[in-house]
Structure formats: structure tokens, C-alpha cells
Regions:
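Bacterial N-terminal signal peptides that target proteins for export
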Residues: 1-8
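Short, compositionally stereotyped local motifs that mark structural "simplifiers"
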Residues: 4, 22, 51, 504, ...
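Bacterial N-terminal signal peptides
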Residues: 8-18
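Contiguous, structured surface segment used for ligand recognition
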Residues: 23-158, 485, 501-511, 516-527
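Flexible loop/turn segments at secondary-structure boundaries
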Residues: 58-59, 171-173, 199-205, 270-276, ...
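Feature activates predominantly on carbohydrate-active enzymes
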Residues: 90, 96-314, 319-332, 373, ...
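Active-site neighborhood of glycoside hydrolase catalytic domains
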Residues: 276-282, 294-400, 405-413, 417
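Flexible, acidic glycine-rich loops studded with aromatic residues
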Residues: 384-400, 406-553
Length: 626
């Protein structure tokens, strides 16, 4: 389902009181820089017109017209004005939004700023409206939605506000990627990083290398838990996968550009290259035939690394990046560079000869040689190189931008060297990690809770903020087999990160955010977007006591919830024992604790049931989940 809700549905479904008294502060994510409430409201009707000043606004005006089912350039008394202005007080991508009883005015120095102002405008509309009607706005006899009168000044803290979608481990269709783009646009994201290649699939057509999609895009079908799948059997049909033709990708790029989102392509090299090597076996050190990995544990680690001593590797990569550079307008191309096992390079005659010829002292310097050579290749095609923080190993390429994922240390190192950085530390922004109590979450690994994402600060005190381009959330898809689950893993952590990357640091307030998040959940319900309510669930915190006994603490991320529990294996409600903040002991003979959350006398979280033996294991390992 496409972006936002349809205004016609709001009109049919709501009856709005026409009071002139200023109401509560509007619920907007990400939080604007400045918002001033006024009295009164603007009433949206079918005669409301959208008027533009400047040819560059034709596309955003058409987009807003389609969202609100209004007329563009008409003569109604109620008007929405879109204006390009020159105002030195307004930062890049910023906008002014003014709502009066007769006029909505969105002003910016750029069409992108106008578009971001539109997203805020849509969030000023009532949230609790049915979805899907297609009648024009405010037909005769229908109640018209009221937009509160406000003055908003807004601009982003960072220029890079992204999400990464791994389409290699599991393939998502063009239509699903466009849905993801629509969802990103609601919250003013501007970069979609597509992880287009890995050991489990090659996802972009390269016309000069047809084997990449004829062979590398497909693998044997498996279901179960990632890493435990059976390897491909001899002669087994490869029926699972897919790829984007270049025409598909042009449509995605254009679709994203219409929403002021740029696509960052990633071709992961020199490691994570099994789909490439499986298609062209001469590119690895072993030159052995391999199957595209279906999600099984690899029999050896090093089979997925390109042979850096093989000149054919660079000829193939030049073909790939010639087509990638021509296809994607983004000035950056991501080359991966992560998790390269270097053992085969250490024993490969070709790699050893390369090291001798280039006077390289070790295999880290060999990887650095590779990255620097790739930077020259991309620069010659008019592109800039970006890679994961492992590209620091052995020496960083002169102009490379570092995407720091193993914590923030790599980003700090790169920034102190004067390089640009995109912060993406796994423990704050990896959207494939558990987001709550593992007993009620689909299986994955690690832990990144909603509050972790919201409280994350992308700029360490020790670096120049100007070198931090921004950041992104990363959705690796090993444990994300379908698009609905991709939505579930993205939201609401994606809401938290949208605010981290857009709003002023000082404006962040956890309790206020969770209230606004709940309003956004209503919008998501009507838009058909799946999201997680994990922040309302109990997290159990076990502790092993002397004598072998175990106590259990309980907490929730959202404040103000009541927790009820039982040890008798029944389903607790708000008549059961209430947790008072003091860790509780397991009674003699009890083998399980069941807990649930309530607010204002009504259940709000899922019931969580965890066995005592599992809690003991967690206590011994120092884990709260998994």
C-alpha cells in the first residue's frame, strides 16, 4: 500500500469539531526544529487548490495532489501554496510550514525541502481515519478534516538519513522496494542503500556478464532457521531468488527520486562474493566450482573471497562497475569490504606475487591495495568509494568514505584522518537484531531495542561533526524471509532513527517520542504497514544468586505500564500479582514465569512465557534475551 493515508477516507470517516481553541501539540515524527501553535484550523475541501510558484515544483505538487485528491491550480478560497524562496536563515533541505484558516504555505529553497514540508503537513491531518476510499476531497455533505493552525520551521541535522535493505539473502520485488521507499519518505529519509550482492544471491543485471543473473541470482529453496539450512544437493534445481533488470532498477531509481530518496548500490567485494564466484569460478584463489549458498553454514570460510592476484578479477569488476556507474545517479558506490577472510590470500601464489610486486608487507596491505585500486576505478567513472569500516585495515584509500558498523571506533579513526563517515554501529541501528523479549519474537540474534536506537548519538565528542555525513539503519535479511517481516523489523525502530538523523539532539525526549509513536501506529494501521509492539512487552532480567537460586527483574521500554506475573503456568491478567520493581524469586518447584503488561486497566503487551532453565542460561551468559 502506498504512502500515507488517503484524504478522501479521512473525510468520509471523520467528523471534525470546528473549535478555534488551539489543541494539543501535533504529533509529528521526526520532531520539527520549531513549532508554534496558533488558534483556528484550515478546513480541507474538494475546492481546496494547490498552487505552485516555480516549474521545479510540478512533480511534488502532483504528488501532493494525488495524496489529497485535490485540484492543482484551481481557484478555491482554501489554498495550499508551494513556494521556492531564498532565505539564508533556512538550512539545507529545510522548510517553513504555515497553516492559517485560509492558506497553507510551504516554503523552501529546494523542491526536496518542499517535499519534506508535505510529509509534515500529512501528519497534521487526523490519524484515526479509514484507509482506501478514492472519492475526491470533501464531497458535498461530508465532514471536512481540520488541520491545526501552526508555524513550523524545520531542517535536518544530517544530510545522510538512510536505511539499508539487504536484497541478497532474501530477494524483495521491485514493488516491495517501492513500498519500502514510500514508507521511508513518510519520515524524511533520503537514502536507500541496497545490498545487491552477497554469498546468497546476485541481484542486479550486468549485461556484459549474463552468468551473474542466469546463475548467481538463483539458489536451492530452503525453509527454517538461517545458518542451519542444508547445502545444495547434487543436481538440485535452483528455483529461489530473483534479480532486477536494469530497466527495473531505473524505475526504482526514478520512483525514489520522485520522493527525494537516492539509491546507494552496494556490490560487496572482495569477500561476500560467492554468488559472483559461483558464476565465474576462475575469480577465486581456488578456482573451484561452488553453489550459491542457500543459507547453510559454509563448509569453508574462504571460498567467498576474490583472488586479488588475478588480473581477470579487475577486468570483471571494471565491467560490473562501468554498468553500475552508468545506472545509478548517486555519486557514491558502496564496495562492501567487510569480513574478508585472508587465509587463502596468504597461500595463493598469485596473491603472493601481487604482494611481492607491489611491496606489500602482509595480507591487510593486500586488501588495502585492492580498495585503493577500486577507488581509482570508481573515480575514473565519476564516482566516490564508500565501504564498511574494514577498509581501514592496511591503510585507507585517499578519498574513501567509511561506513562504521563495528561500533563507532572505525568512524572515529576515519574522521580523525579527515575522512567523511556514515555512522551505522550495529548495536544501535541493526534492524535485524531482536527488538524485545526473544520468547515472543521471531528467531534472530543480538539485541537492539527501540530505546537503544532512539538514544543513540551519531557524533562522538572527539570528532568534527562536519565529517559525520549522517547515518542509517541496516536491515540484513538472513532472518527476514518476506516483506511483511521486513516492515515488522524496520518499524518503529526506523521511526526512532528518523528522529535521530533529522531532529536537534536537544529535542529528543523518550516519553514524548513514545506518545507520538502511538499516533503513528494508528496511521500505520490504516496504511496497512506492519510494525512491532515489542516496546510494550516485558523484558526479563535474570540474576543467579548464591546457592543457585535465581531472581528475575522485569522492565518495559515504554514507561507507565503495569506488569503482572505468575509462576503457576496460567495466563496472568490484572488480577494477578503486580510487579513492584523488586526482583522476584522463583518459588520452589516453579519451572516457568508468565508475565503481561497493562495500561489503564487494559492489556497492551504480549504475554511472555519463559522457562526457568532458559533464564538460568541467560544469567550465566550475561544475556537478557536469546
Amino acid at each position: 500500500m502506498r504512502l500515507a493515508f488517503r484524504l478522501a477516507a479521512i473525510i468520509v470517516g471523520l467528523s471534525v469539531c470546528s473549535t478555534s481553541i488551539a489543541g494539543p501539540v501535533p504529533s509529528i515524527i521526526p520532531q520539527p526544529v520549531s513549532i508554534t501553535e496558533k488558534t483556528g484550523h484550515f478546513t480541507l475541501t474538494e475546492t481546496t487548490s494547490i498552487i505552485t510558484h516555480g516549474d521545479s515544483l510540478a512533480q511534488p505538487a502532483a504528488w501532493l495532489t494525488s495524496q489529497l485528491h485535490l485540484k492543482q491550480g484551481g481557484g478555491g478560497k482554501q489554498r495550499i501554496l508551494l513556494e521556492i524562496i531564498s532565505d539564508k536563515t533556512l538550512r539545507a533541505q529545510g522548510y517553513f510550514l504555515q497553516v492559517t484558516p485560509s492558506t497553507i504555505r510551504i516554503q523552501s529553497a529546494s523542491p526536496a525541502g518542499i517535499f519534506y514540508g508535505m510529509q509534515t503537513l500529512l501528519q497534521l491531518l487526523p490519524a484515526d481515519a479509514p484507509e482506501g476510499a478514492s472519492a475526491p476531497a470533501a464531497p458535498q455533505g461530508a465532514s471536512a478534516p481540520a488541520i491545526p493552525c501552526v508555524d513550523i520551521t524545520d531542517y535536518p541535522r544530517f544530510g545522510w538519513r538512510g536505511l539499508m535493505l539487504d536484497v541478497s539473502r532474501h530477494f524483495f520485488t521491485k514493488q516491495e522496494v517501492e513500498q519500502y521507499i514510500d514508507q521511508m519518505a513518510r519520515y524524511k529519509y533520503n537514502t536507500l542503500h541496497l545490498h545487491l550482492s552477497d554469498d546468497q544471491g546476485w541481484r542486479i543485471e550486468i549485461k556484459s556478464l549474463p552468468q551473474l543473473t542466469q546463475h548467481g541470482a538463483w539458489r536451492v529453496a530452503r525453509t527454517g532457521r538461517w545458518g542451519e539450512y542444508l547445502p545444495a544437493l547434487a543436481g538440485e534445481a535452483t528455483t529461489y531468488g530473483g534479480f532486477y533488470t536494469q530497466d527495473d532498477m531505473r524505475e526504482i531509481i526514478r520512483y525514489a527520486a520522485d520522493r527525494y530518496i537516492t539509491i546507494l548500490p552496494e556490490i560487496d567485494i572482495p569477500a561476500h562474493s560467492l554468488a559472483l564466484i559461483s558464476s565465474y569460478p576462475n575469480l577465486s584463489c581456488t578456482q573451484l566450482p561452488y553453489s550459491v549458498n542457500p543459507g547453510a553454514r559454509p563448509p569453508v570460510r574462504e571460498d567467498n573471497a576474490l583472488c586479488i592476484g588475478n588480473d581477470s578479477v579487475f577486468l570483471v569488476l571494471d565491467k560490473i562497475f562501468t554498468e553500475i556507474a552508468a545506472l545509478f545517479p548517486n555519486p557514491y558506490i558502496h564496495i562492501g569490504g567487510d569480513e574478508a577472510y585472508k587465509g587463502f590470500w596468504a597461500t595463493c601464489p598469485k596473491c603472493q606475487k601481487r604482494m611481492a610486486d607491489e611491496h606489500l608487507g602482509n595480507v591487510d596491505e593486500l586488501q588495502s591495495y585492492f580498495v585503493k585500486r577500486m577507488e581509482k576505478m570508481l573515480n575514473a567513472k565519476g564516482k566516490k568509494l564508500i565501504g564498511w569500516d574494514e577498509i581501514l585495515e592496511g591503510g585507507l584509500a585517499p578519498e574513501a568514505t567509511v561506513m562504521s558498523w563495528r561500533g563507532m571506533a572505525g568512524g572515529v579513526t576515519a574522521a580523525k584522518m579527515g575522512h567523511h563517515v556514515v555512522m551505522t554501529p550495529w548495536d544501535y541501528v541493526y534492524l535485524d537484531l531482536y527488538q524485545g523479549e526473544s520468547a515472543v519474537e521471531p528467531p534472530t540474534y543480538g539485541l537492539c531495542k527501540l530505546k537503544d536506537s532512539y538514544t543513540y548519538e551519531p557524533v562522538p565528542d572527539s570528532v568534527d561533526e562536519k565529517l559525520i555525513l549522517g547515518g542509517q539503519g541496516n536491515l540484513w535479511s538472513e532472518s527476514v524471509p518476506n516483506f511483511r517481516h521486513a516492515e515488522y523489523m524496520t518499524w518503529p525502530r526506523g521511526l526512532a532513527l528518523a528522529e535521530v538523523y533529522w531532529s536537534p539532539k536537544a529535542a529528543r525526549n523518550w516519553d514524548d517520542f513514545t506518545k507520538r509513536m502511538e499516533v503513528e501506529f494508528v496511521r500505520m494501521d490504516h496504511a496497512g504497514i506492519k510494525y512491532a509492539r515489542s516496546a510494550y512487552n516485558v523484558t526479563l532480567i535474570p540474576k543467579r544468586m548464591q546457592g543457585g537460586e535465581i531472581t528475575v527483574g522485569m522492565s518495559t521500554e515504554v514507561n507507565g505500564l503495569d506488569i503482572y506475573y505468575t509462576f503457576d503456568q496460567t495466563n496472568p491478567d490484572n488480577t494477578y500479582a503486580k510487579y513492584d520493581g523488586t526482583p522476584v524469586k522463583f518459588p520452589v518447584g516453579a519451572g516457568q514465569i508468565n508475565v503481561v503488561t497493562y495500561r489503564d486497566g487494559k492489556p497492551i503487551g504480549e504475554q511472555v512465557n519463559v522457562k526457568k532453565d532458559d533464564l538460568i542460561k541467560r544469567a550465566e551468559q550475561g544475556h537478557h534475551v536469546y
